[in-house]
Amino acid sequence: CKEISLDLGGREILKDISLQVASGEVLGVIGPNGAGKTSLFEVLCGRFPAKSGTVTFKGQDVSALPLYQRARIGIGRTYQTPVVPDELTVAEVFKAARQAYKPYLNRWHVLWAMRLVRFSADPDMPAVQLDTLDRRKLLLSCLIMRRPPLLLMDEPAAGLINSEVDDFDDLIRVLAKELNVAIIIVEHRIELLDTIADRVMVMDAGEKISEGDLGMVLKDPRVRAAYFEDVH
């Protein structure tokens, strides 16, 4: 995206944000609460229209496309809370995901995605009974089976214990390096980004204040003032 600005309720949420991420690259996004990280994702996925600026995907301007069309062309998104339908089983969630795209995906796509993310569960189990890690893997499988070139991941480690974070860490590396997926990840756990992020962008008050490798940005006085003083 280039020079993205966003106003909500008369308040400026994003101010001239520009970023790019290449296939196979992981870009981490950090910043204090209220920095605009999730709002940036809302613009990129098409939920919020930007006040100004452009969103480009695979060389084409997609700024005017709504959320569902951006999803169909390959912009995938995960959320902080892995919400699954209360009334559907694991198998029914996969069926709904398969039929959301034309041509319909088949059972082979489901099995391939499940193996990739190391997800296994009784297909007749109500999806709502899955633990947090398996809910995340179920929803990620539903995205991955259509091979999106870009994934927006909003705090994928939220609610996970340390061993589960390590598992998800490995999974993100597989998606980026073996499937060549471009990944933008909002995450508060610096130790996770230290192992998976190729670059890190830091936001504060709706603006990008620093970008580069993690070690470099953590030494930036603006980052220490805006991010770490807020955290501590």
Please identify what each model-predicted range represents:
Residues 81, 88-99:
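Q-loop/switch helix immediately C-terminal to the Walker
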Residues 30-32:
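The feature captures the beta-strand-to-loop junction immediately N-terminal to the Walker
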Residues 107-129, 170-173, 222:
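Conserved ABC ATPase "signature" region
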Residues 45:
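Helix-to-loop junction immediately C-terminal to a conserved catalytic motif
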Residues 53-60, 73:
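Conserved ABC transporter NBD signature motif
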Residues 151-155:
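Catalytic Walker B motif of ABC-type/P-loop ATPase nucleotide-binding domains
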